[in-house]
């Protein structure tokens, strides 16, 4: 009787499941005792008895993955209509579960036969925690809900190995195969209650009416009957997988946060007409800087328009009105200024060229006018010289005529006055060369003057040409 028997649990096909071996020493005959345990499955009166003999047993699980954790105890011991699954998770696995691949090592043992005796008196398994009281049911359910929801992904990954695993555990614990529970309805109720409990802990809102804070069922417009449904555990893994889905928790949490944060503002479409009325109201209130949402709302007088709509639209209007210029606009303006500057420079160059051409033309005209003046003066001088020469020629001709007349008169006189005439002729002849010399001198002077006058205009003309 002292030999030990090894009970080997069937190795599972899942990738993250590891085979477990349980070594239970066979107890001696004088220590064996029987303990009857009643399992009430969701209010049903069917009960099964389980005999267990434990002296000083060491039950060691070498490695239990998180996917096989919720499957080890798919049953519930219920003396007051409470969930054993939540109690088990609360007592043994109260530490937070970080990942689905985490490994738990538990060592449960009883050190003396007195523990088995106390277990017989109380009627509970030695390795299961004591059931909480009625007033602690709400807290235990809330604490277990977090661990249950964190293990939902592991329940989904179990796949088809659930049936084999549960059958092996039932065979190991000598459980009857007809352990059934209510079904989907009770599972849905349990899941909803767990979600509400989790949200109440996160948001700090009480479920009951004992405090002044609003109830969750008032926020979500839920009937209060769902809050008072009894907590029931299910052994049907498919129902639990369908009922416990992380998507529901996410949806409810997002819905609660959005419901508490927002003020249920209806959305409004700003049509062009409505915007025109808004702009008119803002202009009446002396611009967007001095306008207030309340004043704009009073001036617009539109049904369904709230102060939140006016506030947001006024802020957008201010931002749009005082936005800085974009880079494209700046580039276009720079291009325009450059083109204008280039045009101005071109016009300035053209005007400078025209001014220079006009100045050159004025200088040429001035030079031509000066040349004309010089030519006119030369022409006047030439005319004066011609007049002077003509006068000299006329005087010379008169002198010759007078001399010829005098010679003709002398030839017609008498011979009496021949000697006298001879003497006179001598005197005349003596005076004649003198007069001739004088005449020749005067002619030379006249010719020299004329030559000088003729050379002066030629010199002036040469000077003009040189200029």
From Swiss-Prot:
Subcellular location: Nucleus
Induction: Up-regulated under Pi starvation conditions.
PROSITE patterns: HTH_MYB
Keywords from the UniProt entry: DNA-binding, Nucleus, Transcription, Transcription regulation
Region (Disordered): 227-266, 327-353, 400-467
GO MF term (any one): DNA binding
DNA-binding region: 293-318
GO CC annotation terms, alphabetical: nucleus
Domain of life: Eukaryota
HTH myb-type domain segment(s): 262-322
Tissue: Expressed in the root cap and in the exodermis of the root, in the root tip of lateral roots, in the mesophyll cells of the leaf, in pollen, vascular cylinder of the anther and the veins of the lemma, palea and pistils, and in the xylem and phloem regions of large vascular bundles, small vascular bundles and diffuse vascular bundles in node I.
Basic and acidic residues composition-biased segments: 327-337, 419-428, 438-467
Residue ranges, compositional bias (Polar residues): 402-412
Pfam families: Myb_CC_LHEQLE (PF14379), Myb_DNA-binding (PF00249)
Function noted in UniProt: Transcription factor involved in phosphate starvation signaling. Binds to P1BS, an imperfect palindromic sequence 5'-GNATATNC-3', to promote the expression of inorganic phosphate (Pi) starvation-responsive genes. Functionally redundant with PHR1 and PHR2 in regulating Pi starvation response and Pi homeostasis.
NCBIfam families found in the cross-reference section: myb_SHAQKYF
Entry protein name: Protein PHOSPHATE STARVATION RESPONSE 3
Gene that specifies this protein: PHR3
